[in-house]
Amino acid sequence: MKKFTQLRIVAALLIFAPLAALAQNAELQKVLAEMDAASVKFQSAQADFVWDQYTAVVQSHDFQKGTIAFRRTGNTTEMVAHVKTDNDQPSPKDVLYKGGELDFYQPSLKQETILNAGANIERYLTLGFGGSGKDLAANWNIAYQGTEMIDGVETAKLDLTPKQGAGNNEFTHITMWVDPKRAISLKQQIFQESGDSRTAVYSNIRLNSVPASAFALMLAPGTTKVRK
């Protein structure tokens, strides 16, 4: 009798496991389709953020808080972030991505550092703000992990692993909690092989109301410009 019971359990698993996978795939396709529809309407977004950088070797967390904004211009995306505090201490700094370059401004040093951003940065910029489901599926293997409520919003939890040759080798995987109806992520966790991770939580999100003037750094007189 025990043997037949075990056989029934195995048979049930063989039957229902594929059905569960099909159901998850159907939910994922629904999420990606909603993101496609929302992405078409996306123009800009701004939000408050909390970034938690975890360093595994010393088991420490570094928290930064501030505001961030994104804007779509043609086929490209611009981003500006204003860090206000570091571990709750005032530590203003600004980061601007525009025209393929990253500008890092440190007011306390009166220094602007300009870097070539590289070819893959926009894949990460659009990962949670205005990116389409089609683009997401083109660059990542996506595992649908159900829904979770964040800040009163039902989000789809997606785990992303890099596709081979997609240029996403900086991270082992990324987990994001996305509101597919707005193509906006409310939370992201980025994991590296070293064990380091970065968690970003976004709140007070406003869509399609960011002026173009926001995507420029306000440099103090006498600021030194360094290009690397």
Positions of PLM-derived features:
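Sec-dependent N-terminal signal peptides of Gram-positive bacterial secreted proteins and lipoproteins
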Residues: 13-16
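N-terminal mature ectodomain segment of secretory-pathway/periplasmic proteins
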Residues: 26-104
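Secondary-structure transition/turn motif
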Residues: 83-87, 106-110, 161-164
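Hydrophobic, well-structured mid-protein blocks that either form specific transmembrane helices
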Residues: 91-131
